[in-house]
Amino acid sequence: MLLLLFLYPTPLSFKSSDVKNVRFILCFKYFALYLHNKQKSNNRMSFTEHCNEIFNQAIRDYHVTDNVDTPINNPYDIESIENRLYLKCWIDTVQWHFEDLIRDPHISPEDGMSLKHRIDRSNQDRTDLVEQIDSYFRQLYSDITPLPDATINTESPAWAVDRLSILALKIYHMKEQTERKDASEEHIKKCKSKLNILCEQQKDLSLAIDQLLDDIQHGRKYMKVYRQMKMYNDPSTNPILYKKK
């Protein structure tokens, strides 16, 4: 009803005796607008809710084939943060299954070494992508002037998002364990307990990330990003590689 009052046009001409009625209608119209905007604000997803939705989508998409060689089909525009988040979780999901495969006790030395190289490349891709996401945040908050007493966080937003992506994977696979038909009741019970803890951790981490972003946006915290500077993949810093030159 309030929304209808807001949408209904106010008469342009009226008698002086109608002033009170018009003011009353205008008050209702502004109040309806306030409620409408408040409802829109309440319905807007937080950043981490958006992340978790995208992470779950990537995990589901991967498990359609459940094959580490499945080509990615990223549904988001290449310039968007959603594209980076989807790619991040896809890399994490593939690497999760790399880690399963390499622990096969019957894997041949050749296949194991090949898989180890793929894991190394995946780790580097993951690190590069996290740094891209941090660059997004730095650009997003580039106009924010930190308050004089602003503090720094223990990790950058993107590395916290990295942990959130891994948590989504843990929750997915732990839930799988609770639904196994070939497992004992004791196994199912333990996995359900672990699943509850993981879900609580996801809730807490999501809140912490959203609070961190709010603090950065309002100048209470500031970003300071350190590149990972991994050495084992760099031929100039890994002694096994540079000594063979």
Q: Which ranges hold each PLM region?
A:
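Short, positively charged and aromatic/hydrophobic N-terminal segments
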Residues: 23-25, 30-36, 41
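Generic signature of intrinsically disordered, low-complexity, basic-rich segments
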Residues: 6-7, 15, 28, 54
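Compositionally biased non-globular segments, especially hydrophobic aliphatic-rich helices
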Residues: 13-14, 35
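N-terminal amphipathic/hydrophobic targeting modules at extreme N-termini
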Residues: 4, 10, 16-23, 42-44
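Anionic, Ser/Thr-rich low-complexity intrinsically disordered regions
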Residues: 44-245
